[in-house]
Amino acid sequence: MNRSLALLLIIFFGVFSHAQFLTTSGKQILDKNGDPIILRGVGLGGWMLQEPYMMNFVGGADNQQQFRSKLESLIGETNTQEFYDNWLDNFVTKTDIDSIASWGFNSVRLPMHYNLFTLPIEQEDPGQNTWLDKGFEIVDNLLEWCKDNQLYLILDLHAAPGGQGYDQGISDYDTSKPSLWESDANKQKMVALWDKLAERYKNEEWIGGYDILNEPNWNLSGSEIRNLYVQVTNAIRSHDTNHIIFIEGNWFANDYTGLTPPWDDNMVYSFHKYWNVNTQNTIQWVLDMRNQYNVPLWMGESGENSNAWFKEAISLFEDNDIGWAWWPWKRIETTVSSLSITSNSNYNAVVEYFKGNASEEHTV
């Protein structure tokens, strides 16, 4: 084989390999065929992380840890574990993913709780990472369902080690322990988790990318959040140069102080938008950022509103070539998500007991 032909083959297969993955080019996200794509997705909130409002236990527990602790005190550790095992096995199934695809979506965002992948720092020696099978099994199964339906799966670290914000419910933050930002050990564990995930999924073309931290909300300097994000990026890139890295700003993905310019050439800025009006000026700040830094945008989370608001928001995003992911796919007793879970008297009794509105004898 002559050198010119060999070089052409290297270029061809290199381009072909790169085009198999969701990637970026200037201000656009490109699909596996290299064509511009608008991501239209849903977030699977409430599955791997139970936020109080989604479970209807606001006033009964501030976060998942409190809810689980109270449940253990009421029904015991064995029964509580059985509840969580059944929850994880049944909250999202292949039927959900089949439905998401059949309804016209092309992507899914998976909010992950770190404690399904590794132990808290309080339960390990310094620097140790004990890997747990459950989290990886959930991602593996979900990825297979997404492959079957040709949906891109975006991994989202929703609850980081220690919790990344003052809002306890969003990240399962325990105020009695150091947060992500107050503990080098928690930061190291977060980096190690993304290192592990990137190593495992580096060759998976239906992984759409890595949303490395959901909605941080903490008094931070721009350099503090950037330094952690760069560490995570470096860990990912040590294994995986294929996948997009999605970056959320501080204060619920709306403050990008210190996070510009981009430090990676396959990066997307992911903002969130809730409740404000759907006019051009409400997103002009992110459009300006896109234009200044020649980087794509993704509206990675919005919802909890009326159908009229949803329609206006989607029109606004798509008129500006911005993909979106709706939140959430389902939750208990609601009219503002795609699906609503019908509660039952036993669950309602437990919640009312946690809120102090019922006695134990009328609950168990």
Predicted regions, residues:
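Bacterial Sec-dependent N-terminal signal peptides
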Residues: 1-20
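Extracellular glycoside hydrolase catalytic/binding regions
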Residues: 21-22, 182-332, 336-352
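Active-site mouth of glycoside hydrolases
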Residues: 24-28, 36-39, 44-244, 249-257
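Short, acidic, Ser/Thr-enriched surface-loop or helix-capping motifs
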Residues: 31
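Poly-acidic low-complexity segments
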Residues: 132, 240, 309, 362-364
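Non-catalytic C-terminal accessory domains or segments of carbohydrate-active enzymes
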Residues: 347-364
